[in-house]
UniProtKB/Swiss-Prot annotation:
It comes from Staphylococcus epidermidis (strain ATCC 35984 / DSM 28319 / BCRC 17069 / CCUG 31568 / BM 3577 / RP62A). ATP binds at T65, P66, A67, G68, E69, G70, K71, S72. HAMAP family: FTHFS. This is Formate--tetrahydrofolate ligase. The lineage of its organism: Bacteria, Bacillati, Bacillota, Bacilli, Bacillales. Its EC number is 6.3.4.3.
Amino acid sequence: MAQLSDLEIANLSKLKPISEIARKVGITEDALEPYGHYKAKIDINQIQEQEKKGKVVLVTAMSPTPAGEGKSTVTVGLADAFNKLNHNVTVALREPALGPTFGIKGGATGGGYAQVLPMEDINLHFNGDFHAITTANNALSAFIDNHLHQGNELGIDQRRIEWKRVLDMNDRALRHVNVGLGGTTHGVPREDGFNITVASEIMAILCLSRNIKDLKEKISRITIGYTRHHKPITVSDLKVEGALTLILKDAIKPNLVQTIEGTPALVHGGPFANIAHGCNSILATETARNLSDIVVTEAGFGSDLGAEKFMNIKAREAGFDPSAVVVVATIRALKMHGGVAKDQLQHENIEAVEAGLVNLERHVNNIKKYGVEPIVALNAFIHDTPSETACVKQWAKDNQVRIALTEVWEKGGEGGIELANQVFDVMQEPQNFKHLYELKQPLEAKIETIVKEIYGGSKVNFSSKAQKQLKQFKENGWDEYPICMAKTQYSFSDDQTLLGAPNDFEITIRELEAKTGAGFIVALTGAIMTMPGLPKKPAALNMDVTDDGKAIGLF
């Protein structure tokens, strides 16, 4: 019998009316804004603030293969397992971006029998949040160019406009463009460019805001560029923060959906973890904490990216601590980090598994540096052999690391019971959570701390441009912001071919970006791009739609 695709499994699943899912966690009709039968937004003003809030479980991973290691799948499956054990639980995830869906991923709502539904809706447009963010971002670009055209009262230096347009698509041809061409009636000519929507500062702001008032305040602080005398120009100078917030008034509301097994799921926001902070919205997580005893959430890519930013940016801004952290590992990723070529990962190779464990070990040790005990979820794949699995379990035993074989892709929540029990045990223990660095440290010291403590590097080199920016940012009073590293997800270093757990390498910061609205400084390393490109054979080639409107090819 042929193995069913994720989309086929999703289509065979019976969804419950969204009102029934809402009642399960105490969401009243007044707070529920349905988008059809199976999706809704939540009016956060109608959610009662609880004195005792739910505990947060963070799911992260080891350094992934290009196909990913099933972190979203494990996150959903763990929540379903808690549900099976009769715990009051909600899962909180990021929204998928269209670009990667059509590029390499083909979708991002979990997999197998651990998915959030309706899968095709969530992967394609969902409730319109990304379109609203794209519109708000590009409206700001239009306001900037109009200001230049109408006389430039603020004295904006058109060579130093930092704000770029965005599109929710992987489109390398738009990285560098010229705008305002065609004569004086068409605007002021200048160089511009596009980022992908998930890299927009407005995406980060929406995910770090607590309410509309906070959203507007953060938007007003966005630095869009500089004058010829290097004075920062903000959105508040343009006086358009109200208009931009108006565009986002519905997008800020968390989205309610469900898993295959009927566990409530809040899916909201979607910044990438390699070029942004990689976590779902604070509002969704806090709403889930007010509704449930346990909130299972994830942060993008490995512990060096999404989890580091969760700990030092999101948790700091939101004011909560994770009660447990799950590190997802797979046999195939261990073999890749042990030196096996990507086209040979399906073959048994105990030596490669043993060699690749250094990568997992560093991720486990990274989590311990935050004062939280990690639990390894060994996410089972069809080509794993008993000997390879036993090898990983023996390593965990020898190193006193909690581990659970996780089979949620195949079995849904039932395949995550062992993991749920392990996580619940850790949640009952006192954790000594701490941030990696203090905000009062200089920017370069915070960057060096991340590189040395989390990545295993020995030195940070700053380009001449980055050195000038460090000086300027300090003069502007921006040196107490947290750091958001932009780095490859495939390696601890800034070289994606350097696998395993490299030591004594150097990382170069080529450029810094001040996200004064979101409240962090982005440090760009290596060849990281904020507008990805499509692969030679994008996933879109396998996608279609039937005559009656059913999706084909999402996975």
